[in-house]
């Protein structure tokens, strides 16, 4: 889980537009962010395995 201070800092408008970055809406993780879902890969995997993300299924071949 990300520090609350870092989550608050990320919500503020950056001084320059290129300094902005995405964070996971669920845990606040800044890395491995999946733009389509708005969450990080770890949260995505947890929610997908529980079946909470519509249209996402575990692949098997």
UniProtKB/Swiss-Prot annotation:
What Gene Ontology terms for biological process does this UniProt record contain?
Answer: translation
**Where in the sequence is the signal peptide annotated?**
none
Q: Does the keyword Ribonucleoprotein apply?
A: yes
Mind naming one GO cellular-component term on file for this protein? small ribosomal subunit
Where does the source fall among the domains of life? Bacteria
Annotated binding of Zn(2+), by residue? 24, 27, 40, 43
Family per UniProt?
Answer: Belongs to the universal ribosomal protein uS14 family. Zinc-binding uS14 subfamily.
Cofactor(s) demanded: Zn(2+)
Key words of the record:
Metal-binding, Ribonucleoprotein, Ribosomal protein, RNA-binding, rRNA-binding, Zinc
Its protein name is Small ribosomal subunit protein uS14
Role summary = Binds 16S rRNA, required for the assembly of 30S particles and may also be responsible for determining the conformation of the 16S rRNA at the A site.
How is the cofactor bound, in the record's words? Answer: Binds 1 zinc ion per subunit.
Q: What GO molecular function terms would the record report?
A: rRNA binding; structural constituent of ribosome; zinc ion binding
Q: How does this polypeptide assemble, per the annotation?
A: Part of the 30S ribosomal subunit. Contacts proteins S3 and S10.
